[in-house]
């Protein structure tokens, strides 16, 4: 029977809302920005195609300022323990804003996004803003219900954006496949949540930790629930065996959305995975201790298989977007190596790598968009002679691919170095993981460098050397991302310090 809340409970709820509102300013602002973009789209304004992306970019940058102000808030829980503000969440919010801003910017010159048969641009850009909002919530969620709702919010928006090109069969097919895979993974995850709730009677992850430390529950059931939850997070992060959606979705989606999913969605998945497992794993050694299960071995196997499968299958890909999809699976494996370490050094390496991956992967996809605009193809074999036709784009893409491989002097090299160093510092047991990481990076050299091989060492079939006319804004953005890739490879201290300061997670424990 429904019970009317008491005056004290109502007062407590109002107090929680008032306290939480001050910590929720970035999310409130993004909600307003979403409504503003939708509203602008309702009016017949001649320059609407310019105004909407401009408003979106400016709004996202302003939201970054509000995130910056959160540094002054002591790490704490808000909204009755459903939402946290801590350095860890703030770091990911910066990452989501950067990926969102560049998703908007690279969409401006994308021919496929601006096709006449495409949906409303206001709808497109407002959904990018809404997705940033959803990822904000994912990074700060400290309650099973909030985790599920925020992940579903991001997933549903992703389904729409992947199928944005309604006039193209491959986009609609990619959207449908994404919905099917996403629905299955969401079902698995919510079932895992229900098992954890059934065992503990709690949805707050800190309360779950406390319950498991002081009470006995069935270990097998607990492991089953945790594995199902891992499946849900793994789907968003794109690790094996939850990767099946990646190749088809990356190939069929509009390229700016492919770039956005490859960095923003992946980072959000890892944010939830790291927070959940570093907080809910209790430090005790009782029969219900999650550490009674060898999580390190399980995650190590997932990481190794992701690195091997992603890099090996990419060897046979001729479509650039599909190639980078398998590359993304491999990089998810590298990132997972830092998660396995599960201490501050490992978390720092993970955060640094995610930031590095955001820069170099968005840069690579941006160049692919510019090339596709000119030649109308994503096939590697059609890249012949582009070193002369698009000199800046070709040089930049080569730098991004060098960074994705993990070679100096790029930020990708520093990222992998930090991951492998964290593994070696953890102990000799983890050396084999670092060795496999290095070997799979060597394998990636082949499929990454067949792209520059075509651009510089093979002539185009038409024999033409006439340069394509790429816009000034596009060239400036590509050059900026290329410079960041090299500069952070040579002078990585600012990014490393930011990652180091962002490892503080409320209630986190170390997995031994």
UniProtKB/Swiss-Prot annotation:
Location relative to the cell: Cell inner membrane
Keyword NADP: no
One Gene Ontology term of the molecular function aspect: NADH:ubiquinone reductase (non-electrogenic) activity
GO cellular component: plasma membrane
Top-level taxon in the UniProt lineage: Bacteria
Stored InterPro entries: NADH-Q_OxRdtase_suN/2, ND/Mrp_TM
Topology of this chain in the membrane: Multi-pass membrane protein
Reactions it catalyzes: a quinone + NADH + 5 H(+)(in) = a quinol + NAD(+) + 4 H(+)(out)
Main subcellular location: membrane
Transmembrane segments: 23-43, 50-70, 88-108, 120-140, 144-164, 179-199, 220-240, 254-274, 295-315, 323-343, 351-371, 394-414, 429-449, 477-497
Broadest EC class assigned to this enzyme: translocase
The enzyme's E.C. designation: 7.1.1.-
Keywords associated with the record: Cell inner membrane, Cell membrane, Membrane, NAD, Quinone, Translocase, Transmembrane, Transmembrane helix, Transport
A Pfam family recorded for this sequence: Proton_antipo_M
GO BP terms in the entry: ATP synthesis coupled electron transport
Function: NDH-1 shuttles electrons from NADH, via FMN and iron-sulfur (Fe-S) centers, to quinones in the respiratory chain. The immediate electron acceptor for the enzyme in this species is believed to be a menaquinone. Couples the redox reaction to proton translocation (for every two electrons transferred, four hydrogen ions are translocated across the cytoplasmic membrane), and thus conserves the redox energy in a proton gradient.
Record family assignment: Belongs to the complex I subunit 2 family.
Entry-linked NCBIfam families: NDH_I_N (TIGR01770)
Official protein name in the record: NADH-quinone oxidoreductase subunit N 2
Organism: Chloroherpeton thalassium (strain ATCC 35110 / GB-78)
């Amino acid at each position: 029977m429904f019970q009317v809340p008491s005056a004290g409970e109502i007062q407590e709820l109002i107090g929680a809302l008032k306290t939480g509102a001050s910590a929720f300013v970035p999310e409130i602002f993004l909600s307003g920005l979403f409504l503003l973009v939708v509203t602008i789209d309702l009016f017949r304004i001649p320059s609407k195609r310019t105004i909407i992306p401009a408003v979106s970019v400016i709004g996202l940058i302003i939201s970054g300022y509000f995130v910056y102000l959160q540094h002054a808030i002591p790490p704490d829980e808000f909204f009755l323990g459903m939402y946290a503000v801590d350095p860890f969440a703030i770091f990911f919010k910066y990452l989501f804003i950067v990926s969102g801003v560049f998703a908007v910017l690279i969409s401006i010159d994308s021919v496929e996004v601006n096709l006449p048969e495409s949906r409303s641009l206001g709808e497109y850009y407002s959904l990018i803003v809404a997705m940033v909002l959803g990822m904000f919530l994912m990074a700060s969620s400290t309650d099973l219900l909030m985790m599920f709702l925020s992940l579903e919010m991001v997933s549903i928006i992703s389904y729409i954006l992947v199928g944005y090109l309604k006039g193209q069969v491959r986009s609609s097919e990619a959207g449908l496949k994404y919905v099917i895979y996403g629905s299955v993974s969401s079902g698995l995850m919510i079932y895992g949540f229900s098992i954890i709730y059934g065992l503990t009677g709690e949805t707050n992850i800190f309360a779950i930790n406390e319950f498991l430390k002081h009470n006995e529950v069935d270990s097998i059931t607990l492991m089953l629930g945790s594995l199902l939850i891992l499946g849900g997070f793994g789907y968003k992060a794109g690790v094996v065996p939850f990767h099946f959606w990646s190749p088809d979705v990356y190939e069929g989606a509009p390229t700016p959305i492919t770039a956005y999913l490859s960095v923003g969605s992946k980072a959000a998945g890892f944010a939830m995975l790291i927070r959940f497992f570093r907080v809910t794993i209790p430090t005790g050694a009782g029969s219900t201790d999650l550490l009674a299960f060898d999580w390190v071995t399980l995650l190590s196997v997932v990481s190794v298989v992701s690195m091997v499968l992603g890099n090996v299958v990419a060897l046979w890909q001729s479509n650039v977007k599909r190639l980078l999809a398998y590359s993304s699976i491999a990089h998810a494996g590298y990132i997972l190596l830092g998660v396995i370490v599960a201490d501050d050094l490992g978390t720092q390496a993970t955060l640094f790598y995610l930031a590095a991956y955001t820069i170099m992967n968005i840069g690579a996809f941006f160049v692919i968009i510019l090339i596709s605009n000119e030649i109308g193809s994503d096939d590697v074999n059609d890249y012949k002679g582009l070193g002369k036709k698009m000199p800046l784009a070709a040089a930049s893409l080569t730098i991004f691919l060098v960074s994705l491989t993990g070679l100096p002097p790029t930020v990708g090299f520093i990222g992998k170095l930090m991951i492998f160093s964290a593994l070696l510092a953890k102990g000799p047991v983890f050396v084999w993981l670092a060795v496999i990481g290095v070997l799979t990076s060597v394998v990636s050299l082949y499929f990454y460098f067949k792209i520059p091989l075509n651009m510089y060492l093979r002539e185009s079939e038409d024999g033409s050397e006439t340069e394509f006319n790429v816009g000034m804004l596009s060239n400036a953005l590509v050059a900026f991302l290329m410079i960041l890739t090299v500069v952070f490879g040579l002078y990585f201290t600012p990014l490393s310090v930011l990652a180091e300061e962002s490892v503080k997670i409320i209630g986190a424990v170390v997995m031994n």
